[in-house]
Amino acid sequence: MAKSAEVKLAIFGRAGVGKSALVVRFLTKRFIWEYDPTLESTYRHQATIDDEVVSMEILDTAGQEDTIQREGHMRWGEGFVLVYDITDRGSFEEVLPLKNILDEIKKPKNVTLILVGNKADLDHSRQVSTEEGEKLATELACAFYECSACTGEGNITEIFYELCREVRRRRMVQGKTRRRSSTTHVKQAINKMLTKISS
């Protein structure tokens, strides 16, 4: 049997936006009413995505980490879910600064991420419009989903599957670039040797 592809995903966002609820909804198809928002957890999950077995390691960050912890999590992850609460404008405004930190830590690589507006079931208390979420996702050059970890509204499974697909696509592109670059170095070395021999 072929070895499964391994993907490391990390969930970021302000405390209370529903990161843990989102992960638990994805893994168990259930909603948890009570949990400790200060706990950080790592989950393992295996799924078949586009006929390939993928092993996900999902880091659910507490949202209250210090800078060193957060940067460590960002270095660890390959794909990122940035979550805000549609009823909390402050959580939405924290997304761009988070992305900027990610860019700084991951450079020169492009960051693979998905933007998620959670708590879509609380539309009556909405502070962030769907259009604002879409506009930010365009700025961040990433996919955007609105969902509810509480009701299961929105395709939560697709959020995680799409992020895995994107991580694997980026890996393939980087692998091809690396191979091309090493082939170029070999060609340059041979040309230098031939130049020396002929001179």
Curated annotation (Swiss-Prot):
* SUPFAM superfamilies documented for this protein: P-loop containing nucleoside triphosphate hydrolases
* Subcellular compartments: Cytoplasm
According to UniProt, the tissues expressing it are described as: Detected in heart, brain, placenta, lung, liver, skin, kidney and pancreas. Detected in estrogen receptor-positive breast-derived cell lines, but not in estrogen receptor-negative cell lines. Expression is decreased or lost in a significant proportion of primary breast tumors with poor clinical prognosis.
Q: Which GO terms describe its cellular component?
A: cytosol; fibrillar center; nucleoplasm; nucleus; plasma membrane
Which Gene3D superfamilies does this chain map to? P-loop containing nucleotide triphosphate hydrolases
Annotated EC:
3.6.5.2
**Which keywords does this Swiss-Prot/TrEMBL entry list?**
Cytoplasm, GTP-binding, Hydrolase, Nucleotide-binding
One annotated GO biological process: small GTPase-mediated signal transduction
Write down the SMART domains for this protein, in alphabetical order: RAB, RAS, RHO
Checking Pfam families in the record gives: Ras
> What does it catalyze?
GTP + H2O = GDP + phosphate + H(+)
| Binding positions (GTP) | 13-20, 60-64, 118-121
Chief localization: cytoplasm
Expression induction? Up-regulated by estradiol. Down-regulated by tamoxifen.
InterPro entries membership = P-loop_NTPase, Ras-related_GTPase, Small_GTP-bd, Small_GTPase
Question: What terms describe the molecular function in GO for this protein?
Answer: G protein activity; GDP binding; GTP binding; GTPase activity; nuclear estrogen receptor binding
- On whether Secreted is a keyword of this UniProt record, the answer is no
Family designation: Belongs to the small GTPase superfamily. Ras family.
Describe the task this protein carries out.
Binds GDP/GTP and possesses intrinsic GTPase activity. Has higher affinity for GDP than for GTP. In cell lines overexpression leads to a reduction in the rate of proliferation, colony formation and in tumorigenic potential.
The family database entries (PANTHER family) matched by this protein are listed as:
RAS-LIKE FAMILY MEMBER 11
Recorded protein name is Ras-related and estrogen-regulated growth inhibitor
State the organism named in the record: Homo sapiens (Human)
Write the lineage as a comma-separated list.
Answer: Eukaryota, Metazoa, Chordata, Craniata, Vertebrata
